[in-house]
Amino acid sequence: MKVSVAALSCLMLVTALGSQARVTKDAETEFMMSKLPLENPVLLDRFHATSADCCISYTPRSIPCSLLESYFETNSECSKPGVIFLTKKGRRFCANPSDKQVQVCMRMLKLDTRIKTRKN
């Protein structure tokens, strides 16, 4: 009987602490996002950069710009530079920022963002 009460108490404590940790992480993410300097923000509400977003490798495929919704560049703390694109289907992938096609897509997305901003 004592073992089951102790186990139940432990389970309740772990559950409470786990949900609190998630709330804390969400609050930290929101705080970090509010401090990011964005010159021309092209990020959407459902797609945010965090300090942990770094590219380990680049996609070997050429992705058509028309399939892309937004992007952000990785920060200088990452071991290699990168551009993280978000597709219209919600997939994320890393690309090489020195690649000509990547630069074309980045310019196109910046232009699209400026046009949408002016219309609103």
From Swiss-Prot:
Entry's Gene Ontology BP terms: antimicrobial humoral immune response mediated by antimicrobial peptide; cell chemotaxis; cell-cell signaling; chemokine-mediated signaling pathway; chemotaxis; G protein-coupled receptor signaling pathway; immune response; inflammatory response
InterPro entries from the UniProt entry: Chemokine_b/g/d, Chemokine_CC_CS, Chemokine_IL8-like_dom, Interleukin_8-like_sf
One Gene Ontology term of the molecular function aspect: heparin binding
Subcellular localization(s) per the UniProt record: Secreted
One Gene Ontology cellular component: extracellular space
Disulfide bridge map: 54-78, 55-94, 65-105
Source taxon at top rank: Eukaryota
Signal peptide coordinates: 1-21
Key words, A-Z: Chemotaxis, Cytokine, Disulfide bond, Heparin-binding, Inflammatory response, Secreted, Signal
Record's comment on post-translational modification: The N-terminal is proteolytically cleaved by proteases associated with inflammatory responses. The processed forms, CCL23(19-99), CCL23(22-99), CCL23(27-99) and CCL23(30-99) exhibit increase in CCR1-mediated signaling and chemotaxis assays in vitro.
Tissue expression pattern: High levels in adult lung, liver, skeletal muscle and pancreas. Moderate levels in fetal liver, adult bone marrow and placenta. The short form is the major species and the longer form was detected only in very low abundance. CCL23(19-99), CCL23(22-99), CCL23(27-99), CCL23(30-99) are found in high levels in synovial fluids from rheumatoid patients.
Family stated for the protein in its record: Belongs to the intercrine beta (chemokine CC) family.
Function: Shows chemotactic activity for monocytes, resting T-lymphocytes, and neutrophils, but not for activated lymphocytes. Inhibits proliferation of myeloid progenitor cells in colony formation assays. This protein can bind heparin. Binds CCR1. CCL23(19-99), CCL23(22-99), CCL23(27-99), CCL23(30-99) are more potent chemoattractants than CCL23.
Name under which the protein is recorded: C-C motif chemokine 23
Organism: Homo sapiens
